[in-house]
Amino acid sequence: MCSIIGPVDIVLLCKVVDNFGDIGVVYRLARALSELLDPPDLRLVVDDLEAFRSLEPLVDAGLDYQSVRGWEVFRWRETEAAEKAFRAKPPSVVIECFACGRPDWLEALLFDAPLFDDPQISARDCLLVDLEYLTAEAYAEDFHRMPSLTRSATVHKAMFLPGFTAKTGGLILDKSFMSSRARATSLEGRLELRRELLSGALAASARALPPDAAERFWTCVFTYERDYSSIVADLAAFAEGRTMGGRPCVAPRPILVLAAAGKSQACFSSAWERAGRPFPLLELPFLPQESWDRFLLASDFSIVRGEDSWSRGALAGRPFLWQAYPQDERYQMVKVEAFLERLRPHFDASAFAPLAAAYRALNDRDRDTPATAGDESVLPLLEASSSLADGFRDFADSIISLGNLAERLVATLK
């Protein structure tokens, strides 16, 4: 990969495609980079500022240009403010997140030097970094840091792939997440975190919960649309201490389910209503990213989806299921099997078998709609959650040992 010498001015490009997953990763990366750069010389070019505002309330979705957290934030579409700023100060590094491409005005500025205010700018190199989606597939190691050509001798390009191995870029370890993770590692710290969450902005909703809400087995659900009847039934059986056949097996385990805002919330709540409200349910509003992190870290078991929450589930160090985005010809199963192979070394065979079965059942489908039922069973994982915890903790520790993706990216650029 071509290196940039001297101060690093970084531009992050983001087009919101899949709900908030894309901007979620970009926002987290921006925060992590700011923790490493002094000053945090970052410019963000985003096409959906409303989505950005949902994660970072300081963003004003009505402005084409603004300063947020010390960053310059530009709307994707061509604006006078963006062109003026980039003509006066060309970027040394442009990170294209998830193959989003470049705005037309930036494309012209990068590849048509006379457009810059300073005629000497044409001699300055620029590095385009193609930050790809997270994957556990082997190609992540093959393509990480691979250079490629552009139509300019002064504009270079290379790929940067997140991943779960030392030959990839790792995952983003932002300070806010890692600090909350450290608190949630112990049971005492997790209970303290839960009490804070329930007494904060959600205090009004939490008043309807049982008095022992913080001490219950917390399960967080954030996936795609589907019929959640079987998952609700398993959660109810676990709470009542019943086996899959309905026979008493273990002592009842009072639970609290957190239904995250998004595609899955209404579907899950509907299945819960049909089942007779068998356990307490807290419907979460859409939360700023750092608040969402804390709810996920406070949970004993999670079912997550997408990109950013998948990476946070992997780093949390507690049992979780991941639902991949459904693709044509069920290609998501290739991604799921690759991830299972990353998990496998951290579990013994007897524990891994039901875990793998649950991952496959959750993901092996052509589409997700509110009426799409599946045969997934989470009860075996819930019953084995204590024994599975060691394997997930070991897996998380192995990822953290790789280092911070943001730090590795900056080290590569300098």
Annotate each language-model stretch with its function.
Residues R305-F392:
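Catalytic binding pocket for nucleotide-activated donors in carbohydrate/polymer assembly enzymes
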Residues L13-T154, G262:
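Active-site and donor-binding regions of nucleotide-sugar-utilizing enzymes
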Residues E132-S229:
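A nucleotide-sugar donor-handling region in carbohydrate enzymes
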Residues S398-K414:
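C-terminal alpha-helical cap of glycosyltransferases
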Residues V11, K15, F20, Y27-R31, ...:
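A donor-sugar binding/catalytic signature common to diverse glycosyltransferases
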Residues I231-P248:
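Short hydrophobic signal-anchor/transmembrane segments that target glycosyltransferases
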Residues M244-P285:
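Catalytic donor nucleotide-activated moiety binding site of glycosyltransferases and closely related
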Residues D9, S92-V93, L127, W218, ...:
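Structural motif
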